[in-house]
Design a protein with these regions (language model features):
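Extreme N-terminal basic, low-complexity initiation segments
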Residues: 1-12
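Short, positively charged and aromatic/hydrophobic N-terminal segments
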Residues: 14-16, 23-26, 32, 37-38
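Long, solvent-exposed, polar/charged low-complexity segments
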Residues: 43-59, 66, 87-90, 181, ...
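Active-site acidic/histidine clusters and adjacent loop/turn architecture
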Residues: 53, 58-111
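Hydrophobic/aromatic-rich structural module bridging two neighboring secondary-structure elements via a short loop
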Residues: 95-141
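Short, structured patches in soluble enzyme cores that scaffold and shape functional sites
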Residues: 136, 161, 230-232
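Compact, glycine/acidic-enriched structural inserts
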Residues: 152-203
Length: 268
């Protein structure tokens, strides 16, 4: 998944918002008080890491300039550390059902916070989200992986393959066309369809050229990407069981990734 976000990001996909008060603490045992000041605390709340990240992201959305960022670098460092600790735990939990990701480090899955503004009319220097793409093949691979995204008012778990070259996209469509019932059994199952009711973010209007017009599941080959998105409420990542619930979502996603990645492996 890529480094830019458009409600979802790059060859990836995205997540989160939460409210917290003066009594919250971060993962290092630092308490957050009015005015974004940090003081030592003896107690750590279960949801403190996501809350800390989201508060900083709300702040940077309002003050997206270098002067403010440098004045509040301590807050950024604390939020970044909190996010990275969440990513490390998520990698370990995904490894239970997808051992291929076990050798990934946090740095293999996360992105720079600084935006590339060279070709964008928006010259804001910093992103407004934290995202992690957990992909055994790497962040820039065509193969799909698991995406975890924290962003105020844009909360989701997602995954799949995004921005595929035309020949690779055609290979995935061809695989779906050759194994329609197998693919439908995955994405049409109750657990998957409940979490991910739509496959792909964008679609062509009709069945692509070269594919049968009478294909029984035309919506599966009209996809311009093979990704899936699961929006969640702000309370999801501030709950004590966010890790277990995230792993459950990604485990349901895995057969879809396996199918798509098998087609991509043959094409690249």
């Amino acid at each position: 998944m890529g480094d830019s976000v458009k409600r979802r990001g790059g060859n990836a996909v995205i997540l989160i918002f939460a409210e917290w008060g003066a009594g919250m603490v971060n993962s290092t045992g630092m308490s957050i008080f009015a005015g974004n000041k940090y003081r030592p605390s003896m107690k750590q709340a279960d949801d403190s890491r996501a809350a800390l990240c989201l508060q900083f992201l709300r702040d940077i959305a309002v003050h997206n300039n270098r002067e403010w960022f440098h004045e509040h670098r301590e807050e950024y460092d604390a939020a970044r550390a909190a996010f990275e600790s969440m990513v490390a735990e998520l990698i370990a939990r995904i490894t239970v059902f997808d051992p291929a990701v076990q050798y990934l480090g946090v740095g293999d899955c996360t992105y720079r916070f600084y935006r590339d503004t060279r070709f964008s009319p928006d010259k804001s220097p910093y992103k407004r989200h934290f995202g992690a793409y957990i992909n055994a093949k790497g962040k820039k691979a065509f193969q799909g992986g698991y995406y975890f995204h924290l962003e105020p008012e844009n909360c989701m778990l997602a995954g799949g393959s995004y921005c595929l070259p035309s020949d690779v996209l055609r290979a995935v469509r061809q695989s779906v066309c050759e194994q329609p019932e197998e693919f439908h059994a995955i994405v049409g199952s109750d657990p998957f369809h409940t979490l991910f009711p739509v496959i792909g973010e964008t679609h062509v209007k009709t069945v692509p050229k070269g594919f049968p017009k009478d294909f029984p599941y035309p919506e599966y080959i009209r996809c311009k990407d093979y990704s899936c998105f699961h929006p969640v409420p702000e309370s999801f990542f501030t709950s004590a069981d966010w890790l277990e619930r995230s792993a459950e979502v990604f485990q349901v996603m895995k057969p879809f990734l396996d199918f798509v990645n098998a087609a991509i492996d043959e094409a690249v």
